[in-house]
């Protein structure tokens, strides 16, 4: 008897459901989020299980890793692409788990990519760095806003980063205001050290790879953007076509058209936000420093606007990087922006 399993994963528990080939429930149980307990519950049905579906929630790593290490065939459900019948009168965790298992049995499951565990940890270093950069920027803005409120004028970001306790005391004679700025500066110093540490460690593990060196040949891509693109892309072979990669990088439109008219738009958040950021950043740098790309950008901007033109350049760079990673070649600006 072949069994398909669905696991509705939550923060502290999971609902496991196993269905046979006639969609009959063979096993259903709510289990604590404990890998040995989940494996123990599945053990009696191991020989019949042909696949297990896990929701791609924020905490799926531990469960997918444990199931794969135990030899199960695991599928990661792309929850953003799974749509249940909107007229359902009632649904709960049990029905969600059964629905995942049924989609797998029917071959209709929208799947997410399970990034290899070893490489995933390096990629997450870059994601942590990105979060720290955002927090650091928020602290810079907080200092600028405080100075503007209390002095009528502010400082640029570089001047804020160079502030010393003595300079803060001169700018803000009020000790409470000075302490507020100094405490923010202390947090910024810690963030800067952590950002440098994460970047250095990720670079040490990736620097020797040929695909990384090829990415650095692209106009606008430096060490951080190269790391981000390489690690967020993963094995480029998982994208069957260049258009799929461009879509995953959020570099394509999402308009719904009918009879030449716009009827709405699709899911603009579908894809990888880190790749989307990296390619837009690379596009801005490329336009600034590469004459060929700058001319292309100016032609597009004359027909549309700056935002659309930059996104078009980002799309071109994403397509170029796809072929570079796939073929192991370096960047050729005349091919990408002919």
Give the positions of each predicted feature.
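Short alpha-helix plus adjacent loop in nuclease-associated cores
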Residues: 75-127, 131, 166-169, 261-270, ...
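Phosphate-backbone recognition surface of nucleic-acid-processing proteins
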Residues: 214-217, 223, 228-307
């Amino acid at each position: 008897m072949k069994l398909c399993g669905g696991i509705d994963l939550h923060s502290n528990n999971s609902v496991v459901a196993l269905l046979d080939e006639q969609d009959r429930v063979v096993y259903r149980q709510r289990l604590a989020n404990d890998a040995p307990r989940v494996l123990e519950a599945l053990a009696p049905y191991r020989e019949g299980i042909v696949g297990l579906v896990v929701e791609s929630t924020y905490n799926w790593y531990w469960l997918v890793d444990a199931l794969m290490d135990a030899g199960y065939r695991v599928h990661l459900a792309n929850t953003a692409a799974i749509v249940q019948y909107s007229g359902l009168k009632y649904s709960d965790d049990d029905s969600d788990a059964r629905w995942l298992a049924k989609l797998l049995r029917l071959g209709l499951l929208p799947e997410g990519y399970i990034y290899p565990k070893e490489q995933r940890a390096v990629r997450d270093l870059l994601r942590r760095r990105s979060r720290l950069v955002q927090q650091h920027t928020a602290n810079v803005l907080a200092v600028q806003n405080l100075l503007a409120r209390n002095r009528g004028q502010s400082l640029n970001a570089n001047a804020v980063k160079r502030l010393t306790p003595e300079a803060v005391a001169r700018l803000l004679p009020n000790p409470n205001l000075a302490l507020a700025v100094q405490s923010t500066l202390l947090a910024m110093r810690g963030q800067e050290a952590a950002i440098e540490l994460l970047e250095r460690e990720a670079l040490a593990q990736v620097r020797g790879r040929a695909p990384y060196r090829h990415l650095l040949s692209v106009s606008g891509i430096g060490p951080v953007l190269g790391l981000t693109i390489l690690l967020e892309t993963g094995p480029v072979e998982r994208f069957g076509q260049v258009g799929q990669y461009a879509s995953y990088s959020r570099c394509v439109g999402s308009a719904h058209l009918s009879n030449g008219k716009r009827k709405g738009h699709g899911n603009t958040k579908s894809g990888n936000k880190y790749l989307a950021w990296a390619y837009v950043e690379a596009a801005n740098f490329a336009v600034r420093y590469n004459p060929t790309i700058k001319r292309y950008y100016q032609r597009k901007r004359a027909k549309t606007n700056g935002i659309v033109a930059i996104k078009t350049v980002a799309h071109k760079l994403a397509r170029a990087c796809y072929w570079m990673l796939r073929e192991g070649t370096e960047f050729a600006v005349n091919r990408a922006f002919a």
